Amino acid sequence: MVEALNAVYPYDLALLPEDYEKTTAPDAVQAANAARPFLNPVYPYQQPVAGDFGFPIVMPPFFNSYDFTSIHGNTLSLRLNKPLKRTAKGLQLLLGSGLSVNADGQLESSEGISEADAPLQINDGVLQLSFGEGLSVNDHGELESKGKVEAVTLPLALQDHVMSLSFGQGLQVNDQGQLEALAMVHSTSAPLKVTNNNLELALGRGLIVDDQGQLRLAPNLLWPESPLAIEQGTNHLILFYNQSLDVEDGKLTLPEPFDPLTLDGGRLRMQLAPNSGLAVTEKGSLGINWGEGIQVKEQKITLKVTPANGLAVTEQGGLNINWGNGIKVDEQKVTLKTSNEFALTENGLYLTSPLNPIEVNQHGQLGIALGYGFHAHRGYLELTPQTLWTGLPIGNNGTFHTKQDCKIFLSLTRLGPMVHGTFMLQAPQYELTTNGMREITFSFNSTGGLEQPAPVTYWGALDPPPTAKAAEIENQKRVKKRAAPDPPVEPPPKRRGDLAVLFAKVAEQAMELAKEQAVQAQPPEHVNTDWADHMNLLRFMPNTLVYPTAATIAANLQFHDTRLSLRRATLKIRLNGSPDSAYQLGFMLELVGTQSASIVTDTISFWYYAEDY
């Protein structure tokens, strides 16, 4: 019998059979092994010592999970992957087609190799390696490099043309020249610790390691109190709980509560409906948001009642209304007492049969049904103006070349489907030649409003004849204005000599000019610029179907004869025809058979179809 190291606890020497195959190591290796101390391959790597109860402490085996595995909880076994498997005869190799084991137990190929991928090739049934320049096979059949290695990459290193492997802590090269990991643990994390190069498990109160090396609860654990208990048979610590608690993923939680409660971040919270009148105070109490008319009196919710507002509380605690004339209760509902001329509906009180022209508008307001040509303004029923004009051109109101250098008169009056127009131009300081003149254009927007810059200073509606009441009010304003005395004008200071007289005349002329300009800056009384709010200005615009926009055709032009200083001329009127504005009226003079004439026209009338016709 031969003695050998037993790798199973208690790690004594096992007796092996005589025919156990044993490899004899070289003398140097045997001497090195003999000098080494006895190695226990199981944690804690030393002879077991007696514990508190006098028995040896059995620690669990320390093994690498990549090479070993645990079977049935306490048996250490090798971790196997294919092509290895366990059988009743021991560890065997799984063989596929083309492989077999001969009588000497050696693995060999039972089929010839027919094909091979480069750099391998088959010659006469022999597998050979193809290699190029720089490689050769030495006398020992080994592949070697003919040249010298000039450079390598990490973790390889090159020194004196010798290639070596660089490695750090935790790795070493053994006597056989193989790279292996050092069996030393340098650092751990709790509950593991290293003592004298041994890995240990730090145990607290209530934990022990049993004879099988397994971690268990200590038998002297204090008996738990309710709601904790020890389950019989399993010795598991359990917790008793009722239906108000639940266990989810091994954690004690609250189950989903019934409305109006909900869980918010693991905390129980009450859901309050919006506009419910309920709120949670700063102290966490449920309260009521008090509105106006509500109060708490003697810890009771009650109404705030003001008797002066017609409300009262009866002796029975009910809310009552002090009734006045015109109010009654009908079928337990407060309603109005109405006469035969009025009726109550779901929409309110209305006249049963208003006589024309009385009506109730869409806003429920009583008024007069207004037809074409009438409107309500300033509290009176008035005629809607039928004329837009520049006003009487008493002073210069137009622009020929410069501002207010001429008089322009334009009047547009609506009559049925037609608009009657009147035009006059007076610019006596200018002469018209055979070349004609530039066009005077009135441009209007999509609602009929005059666009700026305009050729005239003022543009508005002609006030219709006022009513008797309105005329009386305007007359009182004029009388009051006349009664107010003009402010005194202080005379200019007296100066000596002709120069002082000249300065006085210049100052007097400047004051008269300023007064004239101030008068011209105000619109004439017969031009009302506020009528646009009461008029449909499109009624005065040229019809875009008859006179198209952006189309200079014959239908857009009218030609009228006139006189310029007793000389014959033609006034060309253009209706629309420009893409720059929604509506346009253009006026241009042309001489007939003469060289020049002063620009002073007659009053010229023209007609066209209105836009809303």
Curated annotation (Swiss-Prot):
Q: Sorted alphabetically, which keywords does the UniProt record give?
A: Capsid protein, Host nucleus, Host-virus interaction, Late protein, Viral attachment to host adhesion receptor, Viral attachment to host cell, Virion, Virus entry into host cell
Q: Tell me the subunit arrangement.
A: Homotrimer. Interacts (via N-terminal tail region) with pentons.
Q: What is its main location?
A: virion
Q: What else is known?
A: All late proteins expressed from the major late promoter are produced by alternative splicing and alternative polyadenylation of the same gene giving rise to non-overlapping ORFs. A leader sequence is present in the N-terminus of all these mRNAs and is recognized by the viral shutoff protein to provide expression although conventional translation via ribosome scanning from the cap has been shut off in the host cell.
One of the protein's GO biological processes? cell adhesion
Reported induction: Expressed in the late phase of the viral replicative cycle.
A GO cellular component annotated for this chain's UniProt record is:
host cell nucleus
Residues annotated as coiled-coil are: none
Functionally, this protein is described as follows: Forms spikes that protrude from each vertex of the icosahedral capsid. Interacts with host receptor to provide virion initial attachment to target cell. Fiber proteins are shed during virus entry, when virus is still at the cell surface.
SUPFAM superfamilies for this protein: Fibre shaft of virus attachment proteins (SSF51225), Virus attachment protein globular domain (SSF49835)
The subcellular location is: Virion; Host nucleus
- Domain text: The tail region anchors the fiber to penton base capsomers, whereas the shaft, built from several repeated motifs, allows the knob to protrude from the virion.
Record-given protein name: Fiber protein
Q: Does the keyword Glycoprotein apply?
A: no
| Similarity section | Belongs to the adenoviridae fiber family.
Region (Disordered) residue ranges read 474-496
